[in-house]
Amino acid sequence: MLDSAVLDYEIARQKATLDALPILADIARADVIYYDLLSSEQIKVLCHAQPHTVVSIYAENLKGTIHRLDKDSVLGTALLNGSRGRGTLPERNSNSQAHQEVWPVRDYMGKVIGAISIETSDTERASYRHRSVDSEWRDL
């Protein structure tokens, strides 16, 4: 059984993480999704922070939805093996792809309890690269 101080700490830590995701979505100009691992086959979206700075790659917010976990996906690898990774997804609102970066979230004992996925459209990724090149030229 968990000590009440440890439990309080874990709850506060998860709340702080979830509270920070909307800010991260705007700064990253990407959808940021926190997935909770329900079982080895199911995940639930605890938080879906859609950016205000660009158009979301999802037509609707995914918060509260339950999905089957694809064990071979980047998300599956993060949740089941504890490894962060990158991959591509078909973008929901167009014919292009979205880029996904996933980090596992661990509890105080190091057990993977969820994952944070940052999902960026091809368009926004290209725009970021363009802004980065422009910034390098200004520094010369």
Regions found by a protein language model. Give the residues of each.
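Structured interaction and signal-relay segments at domain junctions
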Residues: 21-90
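Residue-identity detector for glutamine
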Residues: 14, 42, 50, 97-100
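Sensory/regulatory domains in signal-transduction proteins
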Residues: 69-135
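Sequence-level detector for tyrosine residue identity
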Residues: 9, 34-35, 58, 108, ...
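PAS-family sensory modules
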Residues: 1-23, 28, 121-140
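Short, compositionally biased low-complexity segments
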Residues: 1, 46-51, 113, 117
